[in-house]
Swiss-Prot record:
This is Prolactin-3C1. One of its GO terms (cellular component) is extracellular region. Expressed exclusively in decidua. Its main location: secreted. CDD domains: prolactin_like. Residues 1-29 form the signal peptide. InterPro entries: 4_helix_cytokine-like_core (IPR009079), Somatotropin/Prolactin (IPR001400). Pfam families: Hormone_1.
Length: 212
């Protein structure tokens, strides 16, 4: 039986997502218990830098090829939901910020995959990049939790993050709406992953007073 183009794309997306989930479950189950804090920081920095580069690349592709500069010109795409860091004084405070930021992006990145599959799959490997973002964010989240548990054993986790306010537009069948939603998504993700990378670097080198 020959699959239609839509069916083939759907199966492709499901295969990539399931593969990513199995890899993440295996890696996170074995990664942190045998590693030093420095090794974990190195791993998280690598993952955070990678997802920042991927988000930056996706934003660039979207702005230059799909929206012809609309991303850059539209001020609404640069209004992000931010997390306050004014009370950061200790390592555990900074780790909590990293956890909150990564946790905030967990659901939006999960929903990004079907949205990209529907609207952007044919453009420059966007589907593969969406899966990479989803996986990389989970690596950072679980690693930051592992580090925090070593500093504050038994700490309760925040399992109810705020939801991304533009997910409905991301799924919209109207091209102008979902493209602008993608612009905002990648711009804000790029901004937040840059912040997380900076905080991880500050933690690794013990320079919290000079963070970004």
């Amino acid at each position: 039986m020959q699959l239609s183009l839509t069916q083939a794309r759907t199966w492709k997306g499901l295969f990539l997502l399931v593969s990513c989930m199995f890899l993440w479950v295996y890696v996170t189950a074995t990664r942190y218990d045998r590693k030093s804090n420095e090794e974990i920081y190195d791993n998280l920095l690598s993952s955070s830098r990678h997802i920042h580069r991927v988000a930056k690349k996706m934003y660039k592709i979207l702005d230059s090829k799909l929206t012809e500069g609309v991303c850059f010109r539209n001020k609404n795409t640069k209004m992000c939901q931010t997390i306050s860091t004014h009370s950061v004084k200790k390592n555990e405070d900074l780790l909590k910020v990293i956890i909150n930021v990564s946790n905030f992006w967990t659901y939006p990145l999960k929903m990004l995959i079907p949205a990209v599959l529907t609207h952007l799959d044919s453009d420059d490997g966007m589907m593969t990049r969406a899966v990479e973002l989803n996986y990389g964010n989970k690596v950072v989240l679980e690693g930051a939790k592992a580090l925090l548990s070593r500093i504050q054993p038994g700490i309760e986790e925040n399992n109810e993050p705020d939801r991304w306010s533009d997910l409905r537009e991301l799924r919209s069948s109207k091209k102008s709406k979902h493209l602008l939603a993608f612009c905002k998504f990648f711009y804000c993700l790029r901004k937040d992953t840059k912040m997380v990378t900076c905080y991880l670097r500050a933690l690794k080198h013990g320079k919290i007073k000079t963070i970004c």
